[in-house]
């Protein structure tokens, strides 16, 4: 409650009518204005010493709570007043997969960064300074202190900014490409993840755990859509695997083509495959944090989407991914 909105109770005993004239005559003697506690209370008057003490205690308690909130929120203000001269600052949340998605890319590129995990319970995402860099008041957001404190928001935009800048400064970027065709393919999968994969899992989680009342049809609808999305990824990875096996397992290629020997017999059946090219890119890594929570909506990747499961397992073993998911 704002102190300016808080009503201070007055003495309303049975003798209040009889005391009105006395109170008016002695107004200057027994009325005290509390002007040093809050600008919003300058016009509040207390007319009874006992009431004075009670109300002052209430005011002090409220002011203490407001002061505590201001101190908690002030770390955001303090940061923006004293930003680092170099490196990157990532604004995230402990339960936000999209924030960890950006952390994975920063870690993979070995870029110096610090993470500020916002406290949503205290409304830090609505701090004016933060809204200035992310008008959507959500995470993630990134500040590039190397580049005049440039701010970027939305996970996909942040990722493309990072790999494009890295390529420009270093001449190559293994998570991206200098080839326009590959760039378009990587971008397609990245946008598919940000627009179709993550939001559907997010909605399934919401209606399963956080909605105010059960809506089974919503849970079913979003969970089914997540399965459809994984079906798209599963098929793409399976095609990559088949192409890989046919290319590397030459002596058995004819048997695989004829169907007399299943692909699962190949020694390359568990070899890592990727969505674009022969290496992990941001197209692949952007899926990791959300794949890591999809079991919470009742989807078993190992059973239902074995290629997605193997693909995720390979990425989860990467040192940079491990560091990022730990919050290092």
Swiss-Prot record:
Which Pfam families does UniProt cross-reference here?
A: GST_C, GST_N
Keyword Glycoprotein annotated: no
Q: Where is the composition biased (Low complexity)?
A: 15-30
Example GO molecular function: transcription corepressor activity
In this protein, which residues make up the domain named GST N-terminal? 86-170
| Key words, A-Z | Nitrate assimilation
Record bears the keyword Lyase: no
Q: Where is this region: Disordered?
A: 1-35
**UniProt GO BP:** nitrate assimilation; regulation of nitrogen utilization
Question: Could you tell me where the Polar residues compositional bias lies?
Answer: 1-14
Q: How does it assemble?
A: Homodimer.
Q: Report the function annotation for this chain.
A: Plays an important role in the cellular response to the nitrogen source. URE2 gene plays a major part in the repression of GLN1 and GDH2 genes by glutamine, and is required for the inactivation of glutamine synthetase. URE2 gene product may catalytically inactivate GLN3 in response to an increase in the intracellular concentration of glutamine.
Q: Which family does it belong to?
A: Belongs to the GST superfamily.
What's the protein called, per UniProt?
A: Protein URE2
Species the sequence originates in = Candida maltosa (Yeast)
User: Which classification does the entry list for the species?
Assistant: Eukaryota, Fungi, Dikarya, Ascomycota, Saccharomycotina
């Amino acid at each position: 409650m704002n102190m300016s909105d808080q009503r201070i109770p007055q003495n309303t005993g049975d003798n209040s009518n009889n005391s009105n004239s006395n109170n008016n005559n002695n107004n200057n003697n027994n009325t005290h204005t509390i002007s040093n506690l809050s600008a919003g209370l300058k016009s509040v008057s207390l007319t009874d010493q006992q009431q004075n003490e009670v109300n002052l205690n209430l005011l002090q308690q409220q002011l203490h709570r407001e002061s505590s909130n201001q101190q908690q929120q002030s770390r955001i203000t303090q940061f923006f007043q004293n930003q680092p001269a170099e490196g990157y600052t990532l604004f995230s949340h402990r339960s936000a997969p999209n924030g960890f998605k950006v952390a994975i890319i920063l870690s993979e590129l070995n870029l110096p960064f610090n993470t500020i995990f916002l406290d949503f319970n205290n409304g830090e995402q609505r701090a004016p300074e933060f809204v200035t860099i992310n008008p959507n008041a959500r995470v993630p957001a990134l500040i590039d202190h190397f580049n005049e404190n440039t701010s970027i928001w939305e996970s996909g935009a942040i990722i493309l900014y990072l790999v494009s800048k890295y390529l420009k400064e270093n001449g190559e970027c293994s998570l991206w490409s200098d080839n326009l065709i590959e760039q378009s393919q990587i971008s397609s999968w990245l946008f598919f993840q940000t627009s179709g994969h993550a939001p559907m899992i997010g909605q399934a989680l919401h209606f399963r755990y956080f909605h105010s009342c059960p809506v089974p049809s919503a849970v079913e609808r979003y969970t089914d859509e997540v399965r459809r999305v994984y079906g798209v990824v599963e098929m793409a990875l399976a095609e990559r695997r088949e192409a890989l096996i046919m290319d590397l397992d030459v002596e058995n290629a004819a048997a695989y083509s004829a169907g007399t020997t299943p692909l699962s017999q190949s020694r390359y059946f568990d070899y890592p495959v990727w969505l674009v090219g022969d290496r992990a890119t941001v197209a692949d890594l952007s899926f990791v944090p959300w794949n890591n929570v999809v079991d919470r909506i009742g989807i078993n990747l190992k059973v239902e989407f074995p290629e997605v499961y193997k693909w995720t397992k390979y990425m989860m073993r990467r040192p940079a991914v491990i560091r990022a998911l730990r919050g290092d």
